[in-house]
Design a protein with these regions (language model features):
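Substrate-recognition/cap regions that form aromatic- and gly/pro-loop-enriched pockets
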Residues: 128-214
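Short, charged low-complexity intrinsically disordered segments located at boundaries
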Residues: 39-51, 172-180, 225-236
């Protein structure tokens, strides 16, 4: 349903700062040791701000799909299908290009694909903050997402946890985590406590036989370290 979609989209965005920390695996940037934590977050903060990062107003309780559509339509297309070549550059917005007719499904899918926000809405919700990680951690990330989003009790718990999170909180959280990692405060509380709570919610949302898949990430959280930290120390996870 629309309500379910918007609920999960908002919760996914609220989770992004913590997921970025839990999955941080970039100890090196451009051939040099990193200068701070969450290098991936920093990189995306310096890409096209019109189509990356946080969807405008998505953390506002009044946000709806019309506003999401307006966000897409009011942004420059960059690439559009054309007859002369497969793709042509355009500095017009999607809304201007398609003002005279209804977009086809393929055109809508292309328009949505030209956005690279931290969470992206397609025919599914794409939760994007994780770094590339070794396979056991990728599996753990999948288990984490399943435990958080596929159990009604998990969604209820996250509703309570993130009810008051807004845009400024989100941006402040990213800055705090880049500077201080697990020592940071996020959304008014120690991020380490938030990560513990997130892991517990996810574990409770998984079947008994699935909970073991979560352990690689759960272990990092319990130790207050990231894969990037361990790489800097030349330690094995």
């Amino acid at each position: 349903s629309t309500a379910d979609c918007l609920r999960k989209l908002r919760l996914a965005f609220a989770l992004v700062p913590m997921l970025s920390l839990m999955c941080d695996n970039a100890p090196v940037f451009e051939g040099k040791p990193r200068e701070h934590q969450l290098v991936r977050t920093d990189i995306w903060q310096h890409v096209d701000n019109d189509r990356c990062g946080l969807v405008p107003d998505v953390l506002d309780p009044s946000f709806d799909l019309r506003r999401y559509a307006e966000y897409i339509l009011d942004t420059v297309a960059i690439l559009i299908p054309c007859q002369q070549q497969r793709w042509c550059y355009s500095d017009r917005t999607f809304g201007d290009i398609y003002a005279a007719r209804t977009m086809t499904r393929a055109e809508v899918e292309h328009a949505v694909s030209m956005f690279f926000t931290d969470v992206r809405l397609k025919t599914y919700i794409e939760i994007r903050p994780a770094d590339a990680m070794p396979i056991p951690y990728v599996i753990a990330y999948a288990a984490l997402i399943k435990g958080l989003f596929y159990a009604p009790t998990s969604l209820d718990a996250m509703d309570g946890l993130f009810a008051d999170v807004r845009r400024d909180d989100y941006l402040a959280a990213q800055d705090a985590l880049m500077e201080s990692g697990y020592e940071a405060e996020v959304f008014g509380r120690p991020v380490a406590e938030l990560c513990d709570r997130i892991v517990k919610i996810a574990r409770d949302g998984l079947a008994d036989e699935e909970q073991g898949f979560l352990e690689p990430l759960a272990d990092l959280v319990a130790r207050r370290v990231t894969l990037a930290d361990l790489a800097e120390r030349s330690e094995r996870a």
